[in-house]
Each structure stands twice: as C-alpha cells, then as structure tokens.
A protein has these predicted regions:
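Conserved PLP-enzyme active-site core in the AAT-like
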Residues: 156-324
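N-terminal entrance/gating region of PLP-dependent enzymes' catalytic architecture
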Residues: 1-144, 431-450, 462-471, 478-483
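Conserved small-domain helix->loop->beta segment predominantly found in fold-type I
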Residues: 41, 344-350, 354-375, 384-425, ...
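Short, glycine-/Ser/Thr-/acidic-enriched flexible segments
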Residues: 82, 190-192, 216, 243-245, ...
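Short loop-beta-helix segment that forms the pyridoxal 5′-phosphate
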Residues: 128-162, 210-212
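Buried hydrophobic packing segments
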Residues: 98, 120, 124-127, 156-164, ...
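Alpha-helical scaffolding segments of alpha/beta enzyme cores, especially the outer helices
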Residues: 226, 254-259, 382, 424, ...
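Active-site C-terminal subdomain of aminotransferase-like
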Residues: 290-391, 397
Length: 500
C-alpha cells in the first residue's frame, strides 16, 4: 500500500495513475451514446458489498471502466438533449481538477484560503456586473461582497428564503417561527421549482406557498396583485422565474417588481435565473432579462448553462449588507474580514468550486461566451422551425432561451387522438428512448397553458434543452428523425394494443 498517500517518492507513479483516470474520463465524455447499459436490479447486492480487503488501484480502475462506467449517464454526449448541464468545457474541467487537488477551504481566508477567497469574490463581482448590480470600488469585508457560491440552485434558493424570512420578521433565527401562516411565498402556478416549496418547509415556515394563475407560463398580473392584497402583511417573498425549469419562459420582470413594491415595499423579490442569467453574456439577448437588476436577489447556476462540471451555483444579493441578517458567529469560523463561513448557511467546510468558473471566464472571455449563448438559442430556434414545418409534431412553448417542448401528434391538420391518447403515445416514445439509451430527452407533466392542444389540459411533452455546443444542425435533424421513427412504432404496436 505504498502509494496510498502522495509524497515526493511516489509522485511520478501517481501522475501515471491520474493520466489513466483522465484518459478514462475523456473517452467517456466523447462517447456518442447517452448511456451504454441499463443497471439491472440483480447487481444491487454486488454494488453494496462491504470491501474488507483493498485492491490495487490499476485493477480497481479497470473494474470501474468495465463494470461501472457503462452504466453512467453521459451528459457530454451530443445526444444528451434533455438538460443543458454538459460539463465539457476544457477550462471548466481544468478548474475542477485543480480545485480538488489544491484542497483550499473557503470557510476562512487567512490560513485556509488566503488567495482563493479573493478569486471567489472576483467571480461574484463579475456575475453581479453581468446582471446589472452595483459593485463598490473597494470592499472592506465579506458583507460588502453581495453574494455567495453554493453547491446548487436548491442551496441558493433555500438561503434566499432564509434571508427573506429574516427580512420579513426580524430576529426569527433567534426566536423561531411563531406563526407559519405569516411567512407566505408567491410562485406561478404549475411551473414553480420544487426547491422553493421544500425550502419553505425546511425553514419551519410550513407549506405556505401561494400559487398564482398564469398566462402563457407567466404570472397573470391581475391575479398576482389580488393575491398580495388578499394576504397583506403575510407575504415574505415573490418568486420570478427568469427561465422556469420546464419551458424556459422569462416572466415580466419589470412589471412584477412594480406591482409588488407598490403593494408592499418590504416583500422580498427573488429572481430564479438559474438558467436565464446566461442571456446576460449576450449583447443580442440580454434585453430578454431587462429589469433583473431591480430584484432583491438572483439565483444562478453556472453548472447548468456554462458547460461546467458539477456543482456550482451562486446567490447574488442587491443590497450586500442584507447578508448580515443570516450571519454566523463562532470561534470555529474566524471573525476575520473575508471568511465566507460567516455568510454561507448550510455549508461548513467550503470547497473552491468557483475556480471552475474563474478559469472558464478568464479563458473564454465574456464576449465569446455571449456568442456561445447566441448559438445555443439559435439551435433551439432551428429545432422549433423544423418542428413547426413538420406535419406530425407540435411545439408547446414559445422559445426564449433553449427549451423546446414538443409532442408527436401524427397529423396536425387532422388530429385523430384525444389528449389521453397523445399523452400515452408520447410517454411510450420516451420509454423507448430511455430503454435504447442512444438519446436523452426530458419529459414531465405540464398544463397546456398556451392552448396548443387544449387550454390547460395536462400534457406530457418531450423536451429538448441542450447546453452542449458540439451539437450541430444535422444532429438536431437526426434526433427528430429518430423520434419520428419511434413514434411510428408506437402508433403501430402500442396504440393498437391499448385499443383492444
């Protein structure tokens, strides 16, 4: 076991092992298929066996390559078209590897991460500048930074609801929630992300979500105003989706801010822009998120939209000093000016995840990232165009970022199937796609809020949403052809069987 701990004597040998690791990982990422094998239940016990004896690292790597890797999902495949989390940027991978090797802990700065803390501050300031938040010329301490890095959008949203709670009823952290009904949060009906409801319950505020009706996947503004007035004094936050996780619809940011602040200036307005913030890089598309600088906070997920390895999210706060509402005091977290541990709830030891984004932005540059976002948007528009031109597919949403929801309907001019049958057909299509493992498209239930098939009927569309910039138009065309061929099989076999 001479090589279990790195030292100067075995450094060369461990370098060879790590080269092998990188080779395995890169070969996997460059596979065309989304998945090679499906894990069978019979293997569960084997995977759960307790390892009494160790194995040689090369033997273990070979076992991993042959027996584990084929069952992994390849988000970097050009055929992975259901989510944008491709994780295949060169500079992002460099940052991820270095972050793990360097072992910096950003809970404190003076000895744990003397320079890492300041590079993380730089990344947060770049993000603030992109969305239009003001940055001070100089910063004296962590409470002037105006944001934190978290490990995902759920962590960012949970933290912001903690902030909203303290802003709504001061000193709740010390005194506790006395009346959960006074801590309500407004979301758009049917498209809210689960993290908001879950976070509200985790924070002891109960399931006090108010769902406001929507028009074309955006707030019905009259109903929003009515909900605020009906619950006057008990609304702690209103959530705006700047690209909801299903349709990528961008809500009316400026109008919502005006309505909310006119009704109650103390209500916290939070923009969940985990996807939509990417448009801030693009001079051509940033007008879609106009007014985002007016909200109290913004959650963003670079790991979703900037080709970064998991995980990296950020929470940006317009008024940086508000972070004092949720600060921690402990002699384990040194009370020094730039210790992030003072303002990162739910996180203790803190890895240098932001290094991935630091490398990516410094390597590619803001302008070039903007061109990548433009291309991604245009690729979604291309798919929308060919689906609209087809006779057998219908697009369910208005494309604004990179989500295209669509359903196979066989014949637009004469739709012979009812909603139940169309849902059955499209769920069977998805089932076969998943079983074959060549492509990945997402699927979920959603109300047909635009009325493409039947207004507010529950439907099960397929969803394309890619952040893999290796994808070309011909790949999109191949995917549509593949789905169409499966659909014809479904129509021929499964639907006939169902009607017996």
């Amino acid at each position: 076991m001479k090589n279990i701990i790195l030292n100067n004597k075995n450094k060369k040998e461990i370098q060879n092992y790590l080269r092998k690791v990188i080779e395995i990982g890169l070969d996997f990422k460059c596979q065309e298929r989304f998945r090679t094998n499906i894990l069978e239940k019979e293997r569960y016990n084997e995977l759960l066996e307790f390892p009494d004896e160790g194995k040689d690292i090369l033997e273990l790597l070979e076992y991993f390559k042959l027996s584990i890797l084929p069952y992994c999902s390849n988000f970097s495949s050009i055929n992975f078209m259901g989510f944008p989390d491709s994780g295949n940027s060169m500079s992002g991978m460099v940052g991820a590897i270095l972050s793990d090797l360097l072992q910096q802990n950003l809970i404190n700065s003076s000895f744990c991460s003397p320079i890492a803390s300041f590079l993380e501050i730089a990344v947060i300031r770049w993000l603030r500048q992109l969305v239009g938040y003001h940055n001070n010329d100089t910063i004296k301490d962590i409470f002037q930074v105006g944001g934190i890095i978290t490990n995902g959008g759920t962590g960012s949203n949970a933290t912001v609801l903690l902030l909203a709670r303290e802003n709504h009823r001061s000193n709740t952290m010390n005194e506790g929630v006395k009346n959960p009904g006074e801590y309500k949060v407004i979301v758009p009906k049917g498209i809210g992300h689960y993290s908001i409801r879950s976070s509200l319950m985790w924070l002891g505020c109960g399931n006090n979500i108010i769902e406001v009706p929507i028009n074309e996947f955006k707030y019905n503004l009259k109903e929003l105003k009515r909900a605020i007035r009906k619950n006057k004094g008990s609304i702690m936050a209103v959530i705006i989706y700047v690209g909801d996780s299903r349709t990528m619809t961008i809500d009316n940011i400026e109008k919502i801010c005006k309505i909310v602040k006119n009704e109650d200036d103390n209500i916290w307005i939070h923009a969940d822009a985990c996807h939509g913030f990417s448009l801030a890089f693009s001079s051509n598309l940033k007008h879609f998120i106009k007014g985002i600088n007016n909200v109290d906070s913004i959650s963003i997920d670079p790991h979703k939209v900037l080709m970064l390895p998991y995980t990296l999210s950020a929470l940006l706060i317009k008024d940086a000093e508000k972070m004092k509402l949720i600060s921690s005091n402990s002699d384990l977290i040194m009370q020094e000016p730039f210790a992030f541990g003072q303002i990162t709830p739910f996180i203790g030891s803190k890895s240098w995840d932001s290094l991935k984004l630091w490398f990516l932005i410094k390597n590619i540059g803001i302008k070039e990232i903007g061109k990548i976002i433009d291309r991604r948007y245009n690729m979604a528009l291309f798919l929308e165009k060919i689906l609209n031109a087809s006779e057998d597919f219908i697009v369910i949403n208005n494309v604004k970022i990179n989500s295209v929801m669509f359903m196979y309907i066989k014949n637009k001019k004469n739709i012979e199937y009812n909603i139940e049958e169309l849902n059955y057909i499209n769920k069977k299509i998805k089932e076969i796609i998943d079983k074959e493992g060549i492509y990945y498209l997402h699927q979920f239930s959603i109300l047909d809020n635009i009325g493409k098939l039947k207004k507010n009927a529950t439907i099960y569309p397929l969803r394309y949403m890619s952040g893999n910039d290796n994808i070309k138009r011909e790949d999109i065309i191949k995917m549509v052809r593949y789905v169409r061929n499966i659909a014809k099989r479904v129509i021929k076999f499964y639907l006939e069987e169902k009607r017996k």
